[in-house]
Amino acid sequence: MKRRAGLGGSMRSVVGFLSQRGLHGDPLLTQDFQRRRLRGCRNLYKKDLLGHFGCVNAIEFSNNGGQWLVSGGDDRRVLLWHMEQAIHSRVKPIQLKGEHHSNIFCLAFNSGNTKVFSGGNDEQVILHDVESSETLDVFAHEDAVYGLSVSPVNDNIFASSSDDGRVLIWDIRESPHGEPFCLANYPSAFHSVMFNPVEPRLLATANSKEGVGLWDIRKPQSSLLRYGGNLSLQSAMSVRFNSNGTQLLALRRRLPPVLYDIHSRLPVFQFDNQGYFNSCTMKSCCFAGDRDQYILSGSDDFNLYMWRIPADPEAGGIGRVVNGAFMVLKGHRSIVNQVRFNPHTYMICSSGVEKIIKIWSPYKQPGCTGDLDGRIEDDSRCLYTHEEYISLVLNSGSGLSHDYANQSVQEDPRMMAFFDSLVRREIEGWSSDSDSDLSESTILQLHAGVSERSGYTDSESSASLPRSPPPTVDESADNAFHLGPLRVTTTNTVASTPPTPTCEDAASRQQRLSALRRYQDKRLLALSNESDSEENVCEVELDTDLFPRPRSPSPEDESSSSSSSSSSEDEEELNERRASTWQRNAMRRRQKTTREDKPSAPIKPTNTYIGEDNYDYPQIKVDDLSSSPTSSPERSTSTLEIQPSRASPTSDIESVERKIYKAYKWLRYSYISYSNNKDGETSLVTGEADEGRAGTSHKDNPAPSSSKEACLNIAMAQRNQDLPPEGCSKDTFKEETPRTPSNGPGHEHSSHAWAEVPEGTSQDTGNSGSVEHPFETKKLNGKALSSRAEEPPSPPVPKASGSTLNSGSGNCPRTQSDDSEERSLETICANHNNGRLHPRPPHPHNNGQNLGELEVVAYSSPGHSDTDRDNSSLTGTLLHKDCCGSEMACETPNAGTREDPTDTPATDSSRAVHGHSGLKRQRIELEDTDSENSSSEKKLKT
């Protein structure tokens, strides 16, 4: 201190000294001194900055020292404060020339403190130059802008969050007509966004419905993490990173502030205190201290709360709740919404419903009040009653709860009374069936969205809340509601009993009430026109009641309303303008809804999954029953987009060829794998674990099967050689499908599933292995046994004979009696005769390698049958070679088993067959069964 005495004995500014001093020796002495100073305080000195004409909704310190403070509010002006001059010489702030058309909700400095970004209810972001106060650029949005954040490494990049549910990344170097980069797009509003100060590719957001999320700019449209554990779907209004970017502080509606580690969904700590609540207005939070060891948040009880973050991570018990604030700063006269901390000067700035900005400091400033011990208490004030609020609005003559035309920095009792009304409703819990005066209801309807983000209720507005019976004069005098000791000076108070109006006052009041009723009717009419459907009705309710965003009156409106306080005609004209504004906003919302609905149609052609062939053919499975559209919106939307294409007929020739090629690839892959088993390889699939293909282990088949069954198994693997007949039409296909749900054989069920694969392969791939079946299938002596009661055998008509090629049979239950299985297998062998092509048409239910084409034949026009026949003949020729190779696999006993549908009894055949002599005898038996099958085939055709 003494070393700096000669530098300027005239330096009386504590702020200037704190920003310019330099202690020689240990560089940590400065931080340690300030840390000890704050730690020993029970209260802080406070001082007010006057300059705004309405609620102050946004404040931000400049970077690298906090020499400047920028503020904005309902008066639509952006003010720039030089902190040292504003505190010591009461210099007026600098008003930037760029002015918004409505309330200002968010502000941001760039890293060099040369530019200021401001966003608000007028659906635009204005870029200001600090030195010249000129407007550099304007960035238009589609809805109100609630949050801004500038990249810590590039001053040309900034992020904005808006009421339309989008988070946009902007580059100020782009042309004015350039489109921003959309990082997130939700149906609910984003209230806050912030870049990570250390890792600029990460951003944190606060959403009104989805809660707090972490995003990577390299992975748009999908959040990396949603915080909150099982309570992640919460209404969040503010989010802030600490200086290291390792922790997140978030504010949630009607819940205490919460601290997260960026890598964990579960909260580290929650902070609470008796009297703290956050439900009436939108608020912000911030870290405090040189090491971010404190957090700050305003409250609806007019106080500012500071909590200390415990050093022990296990503090707070099971719920990790830190009860008891480190410091409660009392001095505001209404709700505290915004708070910021300057780590260089240890100053705290707070603002809210009042027109003032309050400065808190552990160092005494010129003209400040309060002390560090909390012994000096301010006078408390009572909340305005509802009658007082109504009387103030009616007697003002303008019909508004705020008046910016007077350009007064003094406290506005109407605005204070309006938010007192909100606080009363929240605490007292008004009853919905109470009787109330008509004038009160109309006034509350008129002011459903007054003061917006400053007084903007997250779920309840003055119009949507129920009414309570007005108290009597005695009740209002005796039962004045106190929010604890509200230590503020009692100025601009009004009597609890409004004066008795004269006859002229009653007549003018009646005219105003009639004008208000007409305005209310027009507003309701506009809302009813907007609500064309139930979804739009919900959206209108959210926009008008849950999140009201009324606009501040323009100067023309202000002048007309102030000059015609006694003229009902001018008031009616003003109300008509408001009604037209509501209708315009309704039209814009409808247009935006139609624009959002249009892109959903062209999404169908993006189904590129059919064309790609990755040789990894997963099992077909049902969608995960445990997931719901609400739990995973991304997954549900993709499911809804893909499923319609599965039910629609495929008339595109290229799509048909791709399906045939895919079926051929799958069959070729199956036969190559089967032929490789002759070298003694073990099963490629056990259970349901490998690549989504079902299988069985070698232990599941202890007993060898008969030679006849072995021949049938070989015939099954080599059967896919015939061309699909033209008779296999929709009628033939529909005969099989009714049997698939429960009472048909297991192969029929899998056949139906495979018929749907070509359109939905991609979707089924992502959900493999998530469905559990109520029973298991075991193999005993080469035959399928089911854990449930055995069903009677199916009729002799061979249905779904080729359904064993289902790639997803691992997920489909296989329940079939022994007789029905042998009958279906004999029919298969009789039709295909061990790979030799029949000179006659095959069985009409042939589903072999053409099973993938069955859907095409059933759903496409007859004109495509020639194309299918040509491709099928080529497929049959190639597969005949593979079948010849697969015959040799039967000579090796105890070969690896596969329960892939094409090779279902392959294990039994490999154990039972030991030479070519047995094969010859079995072929003779098969040829004998050809005659039997031909007769049954003729009966079926007739």
UniProtKB/Swiss-Prot annotation:
Ubiquitous. It holds the Pfam family WD40. Residues 454-465, 760-770, 801-815 have a biased composition (Polar residues). Residues 625-641 have a biased composition (Low complexity). The modification Phosphothreonine is found at residue 500. Residues 449-478, 490-509, 544-655, 676-824, 889-942 are annotated as: Disordered. Keywords: Phosphoprotein, Repeat, Ubl conjugation pathway, WD repeat. The keyword GTP-binding does not apply. Transmembrane segments: none annotated. Coiled coil: none annotated. GO terms for biological process: negative regulation of fatty acid biosynthetic process; protein ubiquitination. GO terms for cellular component: Cul4-RING E3 ubiquitin ligase complex; cytoplasm; nucleoplasm. Pathway: Protein modification; protein ubiquitination. It comes from the Eukaryota. The modification Phosphoserine is found at residues 531, 533, 626, 628, 645, 648, 651, 794. WD repeats lie at residues 51-91, 99-139, 140-180, 185-225, 277-317, 331-370. Residues 690-701, 728-738 have a biased composition (Basic and acidic residues). Is a substrate receptor for the CUL4-DDB1 E3 ubiquitin-protein ligase complex (CRL4). The complex CRL4-DCAF5 is involved in the ubiquitination of a set of methylated non-histone proteins, including SOX2, DNMT1 and E2F1. Interacts with DDB1, CUL4A or CUL4B. Interacts with L3MBTL3. Interacts with DNMT1. Interacts with E2F1. Interacts with SOX2. PANTHER family: DDB1- AND CUL4-ASSOCIATED FACTOR 5, WD REPEAT DOMAIN-CONTAINING FAMILY. This is DDB1- and CUL4-associated factor 5. It comes from Homo sapiens. The gene is DCAF5.
